[in-house]
Amino acid sequence: MEKKDVFIFSISKLHYFDSLSSNMLYHKYANKIQQLQNNNTMENKISTILMQIENEGIGSFEEVLNNHKLANTMAVSVLVKDRDGKYALVLRTKNLAVGAGMLSVTVTGALDQNDYNCDNPVLACAKRELREELGIFYTICSQIEYIVISKSKLQPIFIINAEIADKWEDIICNFKNAKDYKNEVEEVLIVSLEDMKKLMQKYNMTDATFFHFQDVISRVE
């Protein structure tokens, strides 16, 4: 593309578990699925297979992103700061499929069918997740910085930094009224960059979240 700051990606409709099954089959894990039939729960099966994939390798970023045989659902990682430069981080509840009990950015989530009907599906997803998880209905600036792929999950994740015009202290009381707050959020932490560094040493997090934090910190050092 000759236009500056424009990129194109091809998309097609799929279901949530399509990505998991297609990636297993492509990487020849079908036999391992059969071996796990006696496990008690589907959760145990999936966890075991993901561990095997992580240990045995999944290929380079380019190999995963450019492989048209893989059904890679797209997601967003959104980190928001207020007008005082403070960031909202989230401790996730322990009942989530990804990132359970871990430290996270402000919101995360996968693009859904409604997002794809918007002019910019990625930013539409970011706005929806902010609204559903924390009741934040607007940002004054949202910037897509990178696309990353986790080592343990074949999912392209758009790294997004955003700002709001308010102070967190003025709106944090509204967070608990958000649609998905109870299911996804254990606690919201309002922190400076220095606090963020300390929390990175204290809590577990996904590698995508770690990358996002490190990138933001590196920009001011």
Regions of interest found by a model, annotated:
Residues 133:
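Short alpha-helical functional segments enriched in proximate histidine and acidic residues
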Residues 1-104, 110-128, 136-221:
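N-terminal leader/linker segments that precede catalytic domains of diphosphate-processing enzymes
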